[in-house]
Amino acid sequence: MKSKLKLHGFNNLTKTLSFNIYDICYAETPQDQQAYVEYINSVYDAERLTRILTDVVDIIGANILNIARQDYDPQGASVTILISEQPVTPTESQIEESPGPLPETILAHLDKSHITVHTYPEIHPVDGIATFRVDIDVSTCGVISPLKALNYLIHKFESDIVTVDYRVRGFTRDVEGKKHFIDHEINSIQNYLSEDTRNGYQMTDVNVYQENLFHTKMLLKQFELDNYLFGDATSNLSAEQREQVTAKVKHEMLEIFYGRNVAV
């Protein structure tokens, strides 16, 4: 087993894991399309997202400093959680009656680790294809690794397409003063995915090793049309219509996966 790196002072590396998670469905009528947006807004409201992110905090072994959350009109929600490595206990100055902190004291809190999530439901104006996007950032300072949250978040949002970016910034010093720009071995984000996740997705990497920048795109392999239908479309489609909708949904997924418009 490789011995731990002995550091001089605090581990100053910042590790950031960013997700763009997409869930696709087909809603045939305007009524169903509106119902889909309302469904997403209710299932993934700020309160539910807070519970999910709180689980992430537990998984990566961090402690919550502060939570800010908001539901938006007409759609979408966001949550931001400030976290730290160590448990936070109130100091005497926080408990006693005294003047509030100076601005520089408040800013000191803002450079702590954080987790954010934003949701973006949207619907194609003609084809009835509905896309639910979730953007998640897990940024940590010190020894806490955001990579521990990978599998949980991918499965929690029943992801059809996932774009994952991981980067390490800054440097830390060992006891001899030598700089270390990364403190763990990694050649692909896929190394940190569970076997069932790797087997379930088609994946491609674009990695810039010298910049400690890693990028993985994931597309769900198994396609069952019934998993992508919402409202009347679950029972009203003819065999021919099912073929057409299958083509539409797969085309949408490929465009998102490759990040460009693809000719039909």
UniProtKB/Swiss-Prot annotation:
Reactions catalysed: S-adenosyl-L-methionine + H(+) = S-adenosyl 3-(methylsulfanyl)propylamine + CO2
Catalytic residues of the enzyme: 113 (schiff-base intermediate with substrate), 118 (proton acceptor), 141 (proton donor)
Cofactor: pyruvate
This protein's pathway: Amine and polyamine biosynthesis; S-adenosylmethioninamine biosynthesis; S-adenosylmethioninamine from S-adenosyl-L-methionine: step 1/1
GO terms for MF: adenosylmethionine decarboxylase activity
Gene Ontology biological process terms in this record: spermidine biosynthetic process
Cofactor note: Binds 1 pyruvoyl group covalently per subunit.
TM segment ranges: none
Range of residues in the leader sequence: none
Processing and modification events after translation: Is synthesized initially as an inactive proenzyme. Formation of the active enzyme involves a self-maturation process in which the active site pyruvoyl group is generated from an internal serine residue via an autocatalytic post-translational modification. Two non-identical subunits are generated from the proenzyme in this reaction, and the pyruvate is formed at the N-terminus of the alpha chain, which is derived from the carboxyl end of the proenzyme.
Subunit structure: Heterooctamer of four alpha and four beta chains arranged as a tetramer of alpha/beta heterodimers.
Function: Catalyzes the decarboxylation of S-adenosylmethionine to S-adenosylmethioninamine (dcAdoMet), the propylamine donor required for the synthesis of the polyamines spermine and spermidine from the diamine putrescine.
Protein name from the UniProt record: S-adenosylmethionine decarboxylase proenzyme
Protein's organism: Pseudomonas syringae pv. tomato (strain ATCC BAA-871 / DC3000)
Gene: speD
